[in-house]
Design a protein with these regions (language model features):
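Short polar/charged helix/loop
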Residues: 136
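Short glycine-rich anion-binding loops that position phosphate/pyrophosphate groups of nucleotides
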Residues: 54-57, 124-128
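N-terminal active-site beta-alpha-beta segment that forms phosphate/nucleotide-binding
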Residues: 2-116
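Surface-exposed, charge/polar-rich loops and edge strands
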Residues: 2-5, 16-20, 106, 110-119, ...
């Protein structure tokens, strides 16, 4: 089986397990993610943190994002601007949310574009080395590469439910390993990146 086919199969399996969680299990786990993340993720006042508006059966990190705002973070959310590019628009209290592509919501096109210092990254599956499988469009890989081209090295924390862990994610040259994974069981530093 090719790496692409293996990734697709791992994505399908991990999403099926995540989808099988009851709504109550997802809510409880999401609240635990907030409690752990709010306590363990270091945020300096003014630090730019990108989050994501949950789609489908994803972890709901909105409580965590607002906890990080209370610690002084400036928040932003991804917006799909075309088939290959996402930008991060500032999330300001009281601003209306609009459809931002890929089934997500966020600030409209008039919002300020920010470069995140810390990225809370959605994923379909992850392994203990910090490799992730996204949803297949490559938006985050390209966004991270663009930040690197600007000399910005955002701290990358994958956020998922513990059931989304797989034994091994095939790693391709363009894939960027995560510094840590946050699940309802804790914030785990990933050994391959040496961060945290």
């Amino acid at each position: 089986m090719s790496e692409k086919h293996l990734k697709n199969e791992l994505r399908r399996q991990a999403l099926a397990v995540r989808d099988a969680m009851s709504a109550e299990e997802r809510i409880e786990a999401s609240l635990q993610v907030d409690a752990i993340g709010a306590s363990e993720i270091a945020v300096e006042p003014g630090m730019i943190v990108s989050g994501f508006w949950p789609i489908r059966s994803e972890v709901d990190i909105r409580p965590l994002m607002f906890s990080l705002r209370e610690k002084g973070a400036r928040l932003c959310l991804p917006a799909v601007v075309d088939r290959t590019k996402i930008v991060f628009r500032e999330l300001v209290r009281g601003v209306p949310m609009v459809d931002t592509g890929f089934g997500t919501a966020g600030p409209g096109p008039d919002a300020q574009i920010l470069d995140p210092d810390l990225m809370l990254v959605p994923l379909a599956a992850f392994d203990r080395a910090g490799h992730r499988i996204g949803y297949g469009a490559g938006h985050y890989d390209r966004a991270i590469a663009r930040l690197h081209e600007k000399g910005i090295e955002p701290h990358l924390i994958g956020v998922a439910f513990d059931v989304q862990e797989v034994e091994r994610v095939p790693n391709q040259g363009h894939d960027v390993a995560l510094a840590a994974i946050l699940t309802e069981r804790g914030l785990r530093a990933m050994p391959e990146t040496g961060d945290e």
